[in-house]
From Swiss-Prot:
Protein name: Pre-protein VI
Motif (Nuclear localization signal): 136-140, 260-263
GO biological process, one term: viral release from host cell
Region (Disordered): 123-155
UniProt-listed Pfam families: MCPVI
GO cellular component, one term: host cell
Ranges of compositional bias, category Basic and acidic residues: 133-142
Residue segments, region Involved in endosomal membrane lysis: 36-53
Family: Belongs to the adenoviridae protein VI family.
Mod. after translation: Ubiquitinated by Nedd4 following partial capsid disassembly; which might play a role in intracellular virus movement during entry.
Written domain comment of the UniProt record: N-terminal amphipathic alpha-helix domain is essential for the membrane lytic activity.
Conditions for induction: Expressed in the late phase of the viral replicative cycle.
Region (Binds to importin alpha/beta, involved in hexon nuclear import): 255-265
Amino acid sequence: MEDINFSSLAPRHGTRPYMGTWNEIGTSQLNGGAFNWNSIWSGLKNFGSTIKTYGTKAWNSQTGQMLRDKLKDQNFQQKVVDGLASGINGVVDIANQAVQKKIANRLEPRPDEVMVEEKLPPLETVPGSVPTKGEKRPRPDAEETLVTHTTEPPSYEEAIKQGAALSPTTYPMTKPILPMATRVYGKNENVPMTLELPPLPEPTIADPVGSVPVASVPVASTVSRPAVRPVAVASLRNPRSSNWQSTLNSIVGLGVKSLKRRRCY
């Protein structure tokens, strides 16, 4: 423990640490002397006793005796008592008057509030804008009249009759979708469907000498398949020359992935 320097933990004034004689900072022992309440109380007691001593000497002196006799002749004590009594009576009378006034104000009936109607100023009338009583509004010469006609929907029975009178349609009412389209048959629905094939050429077989006759083999008829649509292949309209600038322009991404690591040594 002796090797540890505690000066870095002490309060400082600039670069100077407060240690040793400065350990009493924040206590009652301030710089310049101790602050003691007992010394203050003893000083007040000494001051009071000194005043009492001088007052007793002045009251018992000859001048004090003459002053007392003069005050007795003028009835000073009675005047002081009368003044105090009159002051107290005046204060009591003022308070009593204030209380009586408050009580009287509360007991008095409140007068009924009279509702006064506000008189509005007369409206300013523009001549010719509003027709007076007894006058009719002039009718314009070319006044348009609108006539509306309402058409009611047919009844249920009439709608059924109109629907039965219409001939059924043999064609689709909407535009067909090619993958889902089917043939719509008309009146001749029972006629069987036939597949018309082109005539096949007759095969010609050469008869070699001394050959054995070979039985004719039936040839299967080939059915024509629908033509396959060519598949569209995307091609560049303006092919650029393959250089490093076009390669950089065609690169899409966020760039080189980098990773930062902070290490403490």
